Swiss-Prot record:
Family designation: Belongs to the actin family.
Catalytic activity, EC: 3.6.4.-
GO terms, molecular function: ATP binding; hydrolase activity
Official protein name in the record: Actin
Source organism of the structure: Costaria costata
Keyword Cytoplasm: yes
Keyword tags: ATP-binding, Cytoplasm, Cytoskeleton, Hydrolase, Nucleotide-binding
Record bears the keyword ATP-binding: yes
Gene3D superfamilies: 3.30.420.40, Actin, Chain A, domain 4
The organism's taxonomic lineage, starting at the top: Eukaryota, Sar, Stramenopiles, Ochrophyta, PX clade
Localization: Cytoplasm, Cytoskeleton
InterPro entries tied to this protein: Actin, Actin/actin-like_CS, Actin_CS, ATPase_NBD
Amino acid sequence: VGMDQKDAYVGDEAQSKRGVLTLKYPIEHGIVTNWDDMEKIWHHTFYNELRVAPEEHPVLLTEAPLNPKANKERMTQIMFETFNVPAMYVNIQAVLSLYASGRTTGCVLDSGDGVSHTVPIYEGYALPHAINRLDLAGRDLTDNLMKVLTERGYSFTTTAEREIVRDIKEKLTYVALDFDQEMKTAAESSQLEKSYELPDGNVIVIGNERFRCPEVRFQPSFIGMESSGIHDCTFKTIMKCDVDIRKDLYGNIVLSGGTTMFPGIGERMTKELTALAPSTMKIKVVAPPERKYSVWIGGSILASLSTFQQMWISKAEYDESGPSIVHRKCF
């Protein structure tokens, strides 16, 4: 082992050396499962990417809906004790996405790499009893596409090759408005086919895989999951809410996260929800162009509000009360 090798690589650097590394993800289904690795990522973020001293800046962290209490405390503890931040706050990702879209009431479908949630939010507060969690997100779609391509005779097996498939997914797939009709079209002509050049120069052609891959979100049975599709999860979430606010939720369905970036997803959601909801209900699905980063954008909006400044948990408050203060100040 040469002197120039580190014991761990994070982020883009790990991606660029992925051929000789084993890639690990400290977050599973939106919940942190490996705190040592998570700390490495935070350290890398502060010192190598942002190049800031964490002890000089308040930190706003985001969390998955229904994040376990112990996790919230651990997050708080690491920020204050390891990174010595002067102040911090924790907020739910979906709520921040809604702020980014300029709303305080609506139903957010937030879907990232490991987990999807449908979260109803009224006047800035998430309604926990009605949140639906679906353990079907970006990574599952990538895995499914790997499998489908393997059936076609292309072999993708290593963690490095998974990243190639993820790139294919991000560049070429889309959601069909009518899946069966699209399958017919794909069978009858080659107009839906697209080619992709692999890093070694080989070219692969993908056809109906382009829309079969994200269709799993609407029909999880495709990969043997018994859960409801994202349209059904959204409908169930709204139905668990008070009848008086349903109209506001139906009229403000906001998509957020990288796994809502598929072209056609907004139109398909509108179509599916129109079929489920009362016929007189006005349904509006909003897919903001910046939705891949809307959680971050919402966080930057929140943290810059003058009214938010008294919400921070300060180092002094933490020293006095310990990690459990996070439940009293962030809800």
